Amino acid sequence: MSSLTDTEKKMAAALEFFHKEVRSFRTGKANPALVETVTVDVYGTTMRLSDLASISVADTRQLVISPYDANNVSAISKGIIAANLNLQPDVEGTIVRIKVPEPTAEYRNEVIKQLRRKSEEAKVAIRNIRRESNDKLKKDSDLTEDAVKGMEKKVQELTDKFCKQIDEITKQKEAELSSI
């Protein structure tokens, strides 16, 4: 049974990775995930923006970044520009404002293509985990053939469950992109 829980944990990790990737897609609405992973050169090293500042949503099209150290404002602005996210930071004293532009139809279509590609990659990862798990089950000499078949069926049920969740996340994001 421990191999089944290991398989489920691996599949959950693959789903979470997909979910994080999808959250960072720009939909035209302000979302802290757009800039959280931007790297900024400060203190002689590079750090993630989420470690340097508080990121909040001012309204549906604007993010406000409040650095923990006001001296990092210009470095944060430069980091956002360098990240090439098509976002323009606006420094106002000790905060940075980012207006999120309305996406064009062409951009939306491109993001939907990326979303579908990432969705398929996540499903492939889930299926690879299933294959690894089934291979381990077949190599386990302690299990009878019937037990192996039963476990394979449970692994397939897990695979179906996680693939369905990926499809649901994809549909939600596509709907969000289409409604802009």
UniProtKB/Swiss-Prot annotation:
Entry's family note: Belongs to the RRF family.
Keyword field contains Protease: no
Protein name listed in UniProt: Ribosome-recycling factor
A cellular component annotation (GO) from this entry: cytoplasm
HAMAP family xref list: RRF (MF_00040)
Top-level taxon of the source organism: Bacteria
Subcellular localization, as worded in the UniProt entry: Cytoplasm
GO biological process: translational termination
Cited CDD domains: RRF
Any Pfam family hit: RRF
InterPro entries, per database record: Ribosome_recyc_fac, Ribosome_recyc_fac_dom, RRF_sf
GO molecular function, one term: ribosomal large subunit binding
Functional description taken from the UniProt entry: Responsible for the release of ribosomes from messenger RNA at the termination of protein biosynthesis. May increase the efficiency of translation by recycling ribosomes from one round of translation to another.
Keywords: Cytoplasm, Protein biosynthesis
Organism whose genome encodes this protein: Chlamydia caviae (strain ATCC VR-813 / DSM 19441 / 03DC25 / GPIC) (Chlamydophila caviae)
